[in-house]
Amino acid sequence: MIRAGLRWLLAVFYFIAGVAHLCSPMGFLAITPVWVPFPPEVVAFTGVAEILGAIGLVIPRTWIGWARPAAGIGLALYALFVWPANFNHAFNNIPLGGVAASWWYHGPRLLAQPLIIWLALWAGEATHWPFRSKS
């Protein structure tokens, strides 16, 4: 019950974030590190990845058994790969919408990323750790 609720919450969050990446990419482009090639395309790709991952999380296992774990793994990798943008945002104090966030935002946000990675794996049923073994 808790896993299903968090799965839906995560799916809604990622779906909205994916749409935001596609409809309003400027904020995401602003925090993209300079070493990322083709930033507009990468931001668009990440938006599509978030939307597809969100959909994959809520596909019933009886329809496509591998979709949910694959979506969880994909969203976990996504969260890992966009982490540098969060560091870039924090350490370069990049304002979004004319407002610079303080470390009261950046600190917890950076520390939460491993939890977000685990949550994607757990909600997607790619792992059962630490609650029970997969057997």
Regions found by a protein language model. Give the residues of each.
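Membrane-interface extramembranous regions
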Residues: M1-S135
